[in-house]
């Protein structure tokens, strides 16, 4: 097994041991961990003989982006095996072709989570951690140009807070509500923002300089964030479901965001799970969102409370609602924890319909991981414990093929920022 040993020779050196045909892989990890985006030269040291290296190409990976670098290195392990008749190579000496430049060897990206209420912007390092974050109100009724002005201002602020110029950022990503087209950099339509065929990427570039600017739907960006840095990290195929006011979704297939031919794909909240069922906010009947959103859980709780009042049945739902002044997504869960049977009935119904939608998603996409985000996901294991067995019971091929892992999302409200920053 290869190992990496770092050594401070002029503060620019790495020593790598291992099979030569694994040098590229080991070197990627060494550069990513230690030195950011610097180009290196690799020269094998064999006693006093230093053969002339050939020019090859290598991919140095930072998070999800592969940055192509030309490296001076041995072409293949065949040279070593042919000349030295052995499988392993001696240490490989690496040195930088350019100075470190004041230690700023890290790669930063900026992620913008644009919402109808707030604009949140974060500076993200190569480990996909948000190192600086700032926000301001969107004031969605304003002209789009003013909203983009504020996005640019926040980009400059987060860079300045870290002590770097905006020009030193490698890329910027925007997570926007609505139908967006990354190929053109446009928001085609957004329901809660005054955007119609808005060339938002070019508008932002004109304000911050000619940096690469990528764009994705906000739910897709959050799914991408969980895929690269959250609950689904390490998987190539994953789905994120957000259980909030509505049900949002994003699908990652073979490490790519599924958008559909018209950039309106993965509207998972509007798959129909009960024909002619509950009214959805979209105007249709029986959508998953009408059964599995936080709004749906609140409606179910209210209906159960009214039923209990009619039947003269006491329920802790009423006590908790009176104490807090309202019914929320937590009301039924908290009452159930306290042993209330009416609340348990509500929660079982909610989990049943949530499982129905998840089974459909698994049967269609067969993702390695489904991550659950949004307010309801804060229930954690209290939600997962009854949910997972119900899904396992109904999914096709359950117990025979490898099973999809259902997890609570890790990044919370930062998923959109991280996902936007790591767009490509």
Enumerate the predicted regions with their spans.
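ATP-binding/phosphotransfer module of carbohydrate and carboxylate kinases, centering on a glycine-rich
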Residues: 3-8, 13, 17-24, 35, ...
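Short beta-strand segments
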Residues: 113, 173-177, 216, 240-246, ...
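Short, often N-terminal, low-complexity regions
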Residues: 50-52, 56-58, 64, 69-73, ...
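Short hydrophobic alpha-helix segments
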Residues: 134-136, 191, 261
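Short linear motifs in low-complexity or flexible loops
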Residues: 2, 6-8, 30, 77
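Active-site nucleophile and cofactor-binding loops and adjacent substrate-binding regions
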Residues: 191-197, 214-220, 240-243, 407-413
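Structural signature of FAD isoalloxazine-binding scaffolds in flavoprotein oxidoreductases
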Residues: 264-267
């Amino acid at each position: 097994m290869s190992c990496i040993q770092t050594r401070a020779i002029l503060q620019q050196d790495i020593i790598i041991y291992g099979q030569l045909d694994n040098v590229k892989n080991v070197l990627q990890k060494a550069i990513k961990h230690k030195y950011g985006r610097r180009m290196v030269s690799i020269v094998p040291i064999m006693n006093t003989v230093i053969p002339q290296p050939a020019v090859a190409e290598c991919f140095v990976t930072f998070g999800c982006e592969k940055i192509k670098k030309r490296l001076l290195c041995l072409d293949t392990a065949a040279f070593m095996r042919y000349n030295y008749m052995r499988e392993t190579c001696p240490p490989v000496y690496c040195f930088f072709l350019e100075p470190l430049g004041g230690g700023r060897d890290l790669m930063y990206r900026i992620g913008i989570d644009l919402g109808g209420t707030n604009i949140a912007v974060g500076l993200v390092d190569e480990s996909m951690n948000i190192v600086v974050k700032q926000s301001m109100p969107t004031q969605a009724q304003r002209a789009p140009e003013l909203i983009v002005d504020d996005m640019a201002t926040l980009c400059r602020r987060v860079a300045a807070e870290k002590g770097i110029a905006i020009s030193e950022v490698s890329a910027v990503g925007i997570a926007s509500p609505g139908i967006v087209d990354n190929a053109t950099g446009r928001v085609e339509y957004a329901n809660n923002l005054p955007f119609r065929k808005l060339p938002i990427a070019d508008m932002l570039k004109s304000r911050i300089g000619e940096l690469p600017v990528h764009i994705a739907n906000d739910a897709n960006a959050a799914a991408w964030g969980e895929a690269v840095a959250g609950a689904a990290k390490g998987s190539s195929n994953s789905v994120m479901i957000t259980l909030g006011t509505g049900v949002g979704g994003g699908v990652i297939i073979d490490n790519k965001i599924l958008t559909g031919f018209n950039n309106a794909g993965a509207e998972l909240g509007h798959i129909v799970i009960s024909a002619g069922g509950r009214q959805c906010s979209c105007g249709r009947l029986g959508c998953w969102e009408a059964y599995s959103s936080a709004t749906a859980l609140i409606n179910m709780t209210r209906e159960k409370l009214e039923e209990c009042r009619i039947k003269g049945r006491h329920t802790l739902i009423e006590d908790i609602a009176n104490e807090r002044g309202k019914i929320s997504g937590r009301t039924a869960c908290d009452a159930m924890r306290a042993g209330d049977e009416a609340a348990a009935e509500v929660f079982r119904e909610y989990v049943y319909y949530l499982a129905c939608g998840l089974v459909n998603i698994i049967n269609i996409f067969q993702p390695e991981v489904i991550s659950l985000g949004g307010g309801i996901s804060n229930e954690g294991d209290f939600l997962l414990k009854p949910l997972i067995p119900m899904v396992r019971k109904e999914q096709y091929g359950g117990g025979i093929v490898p099973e999809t892992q259902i997890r609570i999302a890790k990044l919370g409200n930062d998923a959109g920022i991280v996902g936007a920053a790591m767009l490509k």
